[in-house]
Design a protein with these regions (language model features):
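Short beta-strand/turn micro-motifs composed of small residues
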Residues: 12, 70, 111-112, 162, ...
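N-terminal glycine-rich phosphate-binding loop and ensuing alpha1 helix
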Residues: 62-114
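Conserved alpha/beta core of the MobA/IspD/sugar-nucleotide pyrophosphorylase nucleotidyltransferase superfamily
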Residues: 62, 66, 208, 212-268
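Residues at secondary-structure transition points
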Residues: 77-81, 86-90, 111, 131-139, ...
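Conserved beta-loop-beta/alpha segment of the NTase-like Rossmann-fold superfamily
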Residues: 134-211
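Well-ordered secondary-structure scaffolds
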Residues: 1-61
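Conserved N-terminal catalytic core of the sugar/cofactor nucleotidyltransferase
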Residues: 93-157, 171
Length: 268
C-alpha cells in the first residue's frame, strides 16, 4: 500500500497496517493529477448546489405563506376526522408538523373556533378561526389568504394544503416552493401522472380571483382558466390520497381509487 507521513491509503485492503495516530486519507498526493482535478470538480459542483439552494431559500423566506385548511365539517367521515390517528399520530398533528418544518414561511391553520388553537401555537402556526364552515372550502381559503396578507402584505404567493392528506412528503412541498420561486406568475401543484392535487401554491397574481370563489369549490376552475400557467411537481400516488371516509384509512379494506383532486382538496 502507499504510505505517506500521517496518511494511510487503502485502509480497507487486506494486510494494511494501522497504527495509532495515523489518519485516513482519501487522496494519494502522488496519484495522477487528473484524479485531483476530478475530485476538485465534484467538490465545486456540490458546493455550488448548496450555495444555489441557500440563495433560493433566502429569496423565498418570508415571501411565501403556508396555509392548511382544516375547518371542514367531516360529514362523510362521520366523526372527528382531525383527531383520527394514522400510525399513532392524529391527522392534525401531522399537518402541524409539516408546517413546522417550513419555519421560514409564515404558517396558518384555518379551523373551527377553539379547535387546535393551542396546539397550532405550540408548533409556531397561527390559528385562523372559521365560524362558518358550512360556507365551504372557498370560505376557509379566503380567510387564510386574508390573514396571511394582513400579516405579510408583500407576499409573492401562498401555498394551500389540506389537513386530511397525511402522506404528502415535505420534500414535495419544498419542490413546490422552489418551482414557484423560479417561475413567478405560476400556479404550482402536486400531481401524479396526469392527475393534479394538493398542495397548490398560488402566485399573488391570482389572489383576487381566489377571494371571489364561492361555495364548496376550490381553485380548480381558476386552474382550468390558466392552464398554461400551471406547473406540476410530480409526487407519489399515495401522497395525493386524502381521507374522506373511514374506508380511506389504512387497513380499512378499500383502496382509494380517487385522488384528492376534484376541488384540489376537500377540506378536512
Amino acid at each position: 500500500y502507499a504510505q505517506m507521513p500521517g496518511i494511510v491509503r487503502g485502509l480497507l485492503q487486506e494486510g494494511t497496517e494501522v497504527r495509532k495516530g495515523l489518519k485516513i486519507g482519501d487522496i494519494d498526493a502522488r496519484a495522477h493529477s487528473s484524479y485531483c482535478h476530478t475530485i476538485s470538480d465534484k467538490a465545486r459542483a456540490v458546493g455550488g448546489a448548496v450555495l444555489e439552494a441557500v440563495s433560493l431559500y433566502e429569496k423565498m423566506a418570508g415571501r411565501y405563506a403556508f396555509v392548511t385548511l382544516a375547518a371542514g365539517l367531516g360529514t362523510r367521515f362521520g366523526g372527528n376526522k382531525l383527531e383520527t390517528e394514522i400510525d399513532g399520530i392524529p391527522l392534525y398533528v401531522r399537518a402541524l408538523r409539516r408546517m413546522q418544518i417550513f419555519g421560514g414561511f409564515p404558517s396558518y391553520l384555518v379551523a373551527a373556533p377553539g379547535c387546535m388553537e393551542k396546539e397550532a401555537l405550540d408548533y409556531g402556526v397561527v390559528p385562523v378561526e372559521n365560524r362558518e364552515p358550512e360556507r365551504g372550502i372557498s370560505h376557509s381559503l379566503k380567510l387564510g389568504l386574508e390573514r396571511a396578507l394582513k400579516d405579510n402584505p408583500d407576499l409573492k404567493g401562498v401555498l394551500f394544503s389540506v389537513c386530511d392528506q397525511p402522506w404528502i412528503d415535505p420534500a414535495t412541498i419544498q419542490q413546490i416552493f422552489n418551482t414557484a420561486a423560479l417561475h413567478p406568475g405560476s400556479i404550482v401543484c402536486a400531481g401524479c401522472g396526469d392527475s393534479r392535487g394538493n398542495p397548490v401554491l398560488w402566485d399573488r397574481a391570482y389572489f383576487l380571483e381566489l377571494t371571489a370563489l364561492e361555495g364548496d369549490r376550490g381553485g380548480k376552475q381558476i386552474m382550468e382558466k390558466y392552464r398554461d400557467k400551471v406547473r406540476v411537481v410530480q409526487a407519489g400516488e399515495k401522497e395525493l390520497r386524502d381521507i374522506d371516509v373511514r374506508e380511506d384509512l389504512p387497513g380499512a379494506g378499500r383502496r382509494k381509487e380517487r385522488r384528492g383532486d376534484e376541488n384540489y382538496g376537500s377540506e378536512a
